């Protein structure tokens, strides 16, 4: 009897513990870093709960903050009109951002800096401050450092909390190892901690595996979470950072554009690390040359966040994503919408003449059947439909079936040209036809190769970064879908 009672008590305690450490879906956060130098594209404000605007820097007199591109910060803050629940912080620091050590070294400097942070929060209508000091006591990034930095970091958090008050947010970004910071001393001042779950190695190792595998670099995400918890950060105060970019040789234009286009020129093959739960590209020798994430691995990481009872996820940074925002959509649907790792649908746009024909109906039906099997949806539009700005960017593939493209208005033509020239997606034209009055399209179509559909072809202008395009091949829809790996 006594044994049974003990077991019952232990079960109740375990259940209570799980309930208390697991972040509830309504409380879960998704933090997006938005960079000051990416002011040509604002983020979609409904896909995250928090934005960290990067960056501000400690000023040269160690007693205040300099903000990069203040007009863009104002535009980011204005996104609250579209999502009033959105929280926006100024992130101060970043790799090679210095003057932290000198600022944190004296009470006078810390107090002045903290007061300036509060002034900026009030001036711009911000919700708080994020500190990204990389890293206390370390001069690896070419910044000044002192053995006293760890102690002074805690004092800085104390002084920032005092200046900001309890109604404003105070967060930090940390290295996966949980080094350089006395978390037990300073976590009480923090709302949460953003683990930078990326950049832990270079090829031939992967920089962001969930679990340790033969391809893992310095540390896995699992080990990084464990290190933070061991050093005093409760799971409900942790967010796990995920990259929206790949890591490898960025001077290689094919690899550098892979995250945007999803295609290579045939020299590289995509593989999956079943232990680390991440994809990667290998060259002809089988060597890893590009470590990255895709919807499958982002969904796996989000599920791991849920399973570990963390507060949420974070990512760097919004413009590294492709035009369809696959990374951001995966993280949003997984953590905020469905409460489980979810791979979002891809999207195919079929352009038709609007006139019914047996051939067109068969192609559309075939695409819809394929979509149910391969996880994409199909939108069919007549050639005289109205288009909103950035409409084409929603789609991973535009399938030009039998539309009369001469009916597209000037605005729609500009959007289509951007879609093509900036590699925002793939295009397939079932027939090779000129478009009266559209010189750009006629030049573009003449430059394309006819795809035999037995290998992936790039256009002759691949060096300009254009995506994979096919014109003039009467291929079946299934062949096109297979070619584009939808």
Question: What kind of feature is each model-predicted range?
Answer:
Residues 1-25:
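Bacterial Sec-dependent N-terminal signal peptides
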Residues 24-26, 345-375:
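Short, charged N-terminal beta->alpha structural module
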Residues 24-121, 333:
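Glycan-recognition patch characteristic of GH18 chitinases/ENGases
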Residues 31, 59-71, 115, 136-267:
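Substrate-binding surface in catalytic domains of secreted glycosidases
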Residues 36-40, 368-391:
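A short, well-structured beta->alpha microelement
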Residues 51, 90, 131, 160, ...:
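Conserved, mostly hydrophobic/aromatic
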Residues 92, 237-304, 330-339:
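Glycan-binding loop/region signatures in secreted carbohydrate-active enzymes
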Residues 359-364, 368, 400, 405-485:
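A glycine-rich, often tryptophan-bearing local segment used as a flexible ligand/cofactor-contacting loop or short
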């Amino acid at each position: 009897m006594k044994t049974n009672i003990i077991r019952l008590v232990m079960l109740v305690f375990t259940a209570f513990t799980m309930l208390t450490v697991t972040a509830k879906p309504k409380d879960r956060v998704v933090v997006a870093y938005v960079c000051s130098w990416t002011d040509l594209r604002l983020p979609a404000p409904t896909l995250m709960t928090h934005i960290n605007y990067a960056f501000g820097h400690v000023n040269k007199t160690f007693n205040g903050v300099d903000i990069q591109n203040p007009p863009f910060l104002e535009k980011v803050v204005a996104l609250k009109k579209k999502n009033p629940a959105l929280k926006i912080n100024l992130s101060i620091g970043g790799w090679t951002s210095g003057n932290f050590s000198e600022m944190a070294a004296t009470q006078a400097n810390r107090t002045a800096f903290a007061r300036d942070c509060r002034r900026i929060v009030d001036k711009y209508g911000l919700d708080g401050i994020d500190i990204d000091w990389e890293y206390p006591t370390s001069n690896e990034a070419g910044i000044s450092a002192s053995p006293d930095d760890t102690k002074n970091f805690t004092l800085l958090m104390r002084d920032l909390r005092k200046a900001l008050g309890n109604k404003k947010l105070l967060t930090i970004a940390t290295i996966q190892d949980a080094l350089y910071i006395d978390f037990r001393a300073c976590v009480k001042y923090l709302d949460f901690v953003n683990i930078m779950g990326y950049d832990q190695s270079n090829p031939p190792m992967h920089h962001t595996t969930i679990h340790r595998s033969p391809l893992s670099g310095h540390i896995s995400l699992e080990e990084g979470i464990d290190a933070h918890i061991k050093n005093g950060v409760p799971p409900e105060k942790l967010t796990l950072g995920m990259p929206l970019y790949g890591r490898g040789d960025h001077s290689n234009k094919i690899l550098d554009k892979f995250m945007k286009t999803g295609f290579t020129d045939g020299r590289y093959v995509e593989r999956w690390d079943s232990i680390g739960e991440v994809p990667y590209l290998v060259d002809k020798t089988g060597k890893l040359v590009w470590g990255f994430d895709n919807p499958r691995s982002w969904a796996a990481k989000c599920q791991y966040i849920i399973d570990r009872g963390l507060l949420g996820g974070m990512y760097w940074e919004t413009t590294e994503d492709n035009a369809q925002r696959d990374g951001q959509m995966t993280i949003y649907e997984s953590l905020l919408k469905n409460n489980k790792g979810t791979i979002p649908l891809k999207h195919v746009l079929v352009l038709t003449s609007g006139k019914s024909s047996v051939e067109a109906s068969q192609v559309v039906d075939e695409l819809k059947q394929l979509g149910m099997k391969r996880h994409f949806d199909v939108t069919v539009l007549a050639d005289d439909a109205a288009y909103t700005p950035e409409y084409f960017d929603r789609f991973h593939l535009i399938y030009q079936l039998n539309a009369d493209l001469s009916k597209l208005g000037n605005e729609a033509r500009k959007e289509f040209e951007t879609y093509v020239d900036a590699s925002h997606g793939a295009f397939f034209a079932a027939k090779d036809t000129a478009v009266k009055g559209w010189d750009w399209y006629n030049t573009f179509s003449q430059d394309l190769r006819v795809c035999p559909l037995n290998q992936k072809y790039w256009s002759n202008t691949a060096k300009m970064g254009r995506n994979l395009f096919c014109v003039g091949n009467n291929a079946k829809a299934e062949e096109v879908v297979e070619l584009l790996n939808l």
